[in-house]
Amino acid sequence: MSAHAQAKKAIAFVDGQNLFAAARDAFGITTASYGVAALSQAIAAQRGWEVAEVRFYTGVPERHDNPGLRFWWTARLRRLRADGVAVTARPLRRRRKRARLDDGRQLEFDVLEEKGIDIRIALDVVRAVLERQCDVVLLFSQDQDFAELAREVRRIAARQRRWVDIASAYPVGSGTRNSRGVDGTDWIRVDRGLYDACLDERDSRP
């Protein structure tokens, strides 16, 4: 945490799909069973911050694409809301992708992509800083698209004559391919011990 920050009120902004992808690569997990509130509180406690709010953002598959996973996410988001987490969900849309193999052949495949989550997170962060809702932005993501957001947070804070810390938190383990946080933020690496200590056991898939 930066020495410039005096107040410690933090809002956690959790990019659910990005956090899951990082945990999958780092630890080999197959289910998004992270406890977002517990993880936010644990990181804040290590740094002397007080968590004012946790906001969770994710894409959810359509019923016709994956009914089982949609049911799981619907139940998961319902529990998060009951726990006081602010939830923003967007549909995952199927997109056709093409890739060229080393031997020159072209491969076509379908992927599910979320649209609008990054923009929603950025808008909510800017609004929170403009309205002085927090002194620390705790961003669970490695998405470099947020580097410009970090610069904007600094500009807003400078105009307000205060310091706002912005940190990106993400899992790092033996399988991690990208160990960088968002440029322009403080990087908080989440190890397997901390990640496992904050699991939401209610989310275990049968």
What are these regions (language model features)?
Residues 1-110, 169:
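Domain-level signal for Mg2+-assisted phosphodiester chemistry and nucleotide/NA-binding surfaces
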Residues 87-206:
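Nuclease catalytic cores that cleave nucleic-acid phosphodiester bonds
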